Amino acid sequence: MVLLSSLNVLLILFPGFNTLDMNGPYEVLRKSGLSQNFNVTVASETDITTSIEGLHARRDIAIDHALVQQLPDFDVLVVPGGVAGPGSAVEAQAANITSPFMTLIKEFADVAPLSTARPRVLLSICTGAIFLGTMGVFNDRYCTTHWKALTDLQKSVNDAAARTHGRPGTVVPARFVDSGNNTSGVRIISSGGVSAGLDASLYLVKSLFGEEEALDTAEMLDYAWHKTDGVVLDGMRYY
């Protein structure tokens, strides 16, 4: 599918996010079509959100229950990660499953596209996959994350499946995984660690606007795109 109109992207932040997890996808999407293909909105629960590296990011819009009601207005949701493991910012954020941040992720995954001409995509970057796994988004799906967090992601996936009476997903090591559309028609893509978010984002550009557009974007960024290092599923077959 090659789209002719621009898409609205929501990129959500939490305290302790990884800077490249945010900036990598942001720059890819903003450079695609020289900013013509994607309109990117940054959201967080606080006006200023500080990354694990100390960068202060100002939001465009608040993550609250009102924003959850506006999710049909957005075509793509990007969820960055950060340091995972016991006592980490990712663990603390994932533990609060009723927060607006976590609720927004699950609600986006459940909102069907308004039309086939405007697909919906949920893209996790690095350990942002743990948030999706915790909310059951990866039930019965393949997914990936940073290589050091593969076990953490599998645990979150297994725990969510038990809590929601679903079938656990399968975690695999890869630069990115496109597991196809869920039952609501939302495409679920997860990336490996940090810089792999660039590859997943370029893959997203390719999927929506064509390979030439993705190659032009990679050239503009002077980035060697690992375009064949991902896993793309045909239905639920892994190959």
Where are these regions (language model features)?
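N-terminal beta1-alpha1 cap of cysteine-dependent amidohydrolase-like domains
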Residues: V2-D73
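Active-site-adjacent pocket-lining segments in enzyme domains
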Residues: V2-L11, L67-Y239
